[in-house]
């Protein structure tokens, strides 16, 4: 840390997030690679939703599934202890771009939205 820098102080929730990410780094990378190579089009992400829900459960996080067709919520703090709530939103649907280098041959979908 540079001499003038203020140290970053994390609260309990922030530290819990960092710890989960650090402890599961390789699993997170493998998950991302798997989703990338098995792209599914919007409202048809059934494999993706199931894989995400199972991944969150493996991390010990309670989930709610089948929200708005393929949506999944995972709770870091389901009981809202200390009035803290956290949302992580990710769009995991793909665009139909069959000519893309990494397009899923089954769905012709590719993750190349850029958002």
Segments from the language model and where they lie:
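Acidic/His- and Gly-rich active-site-bordering loop/insert found
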Residues: 3-112
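Short, conserved phosphate/pyrophosphate- and ester-handling motifs at nucleotide-, phospho-/glycolipid
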Residues: 115
């Amino acid at each position: 840390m540079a001499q003038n820098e203020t140290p970053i102080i994390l609260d309990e929730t922030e530290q819990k997030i960092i710890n989960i990410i650090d402890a599961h780094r390789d699993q997170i990378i493998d998950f991302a690679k798997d989703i990338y190579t098995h792209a599914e089009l919007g409202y048809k992400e059934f494999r993706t939703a199931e894989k995400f829900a199972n991944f969150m459960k493996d991390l010990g996080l309670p989930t709610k599934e089948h929200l708005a067709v393929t949506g999944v919520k995972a709770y870091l703090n389901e009981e809202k202890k200390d009035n803290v709530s956290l949302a992580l939103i990710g769009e995991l649907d793909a665009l139909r771009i069959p000519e893309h280098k990494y397009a899923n041959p089954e769905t012709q979908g590719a993750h190349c939205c850029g958002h």
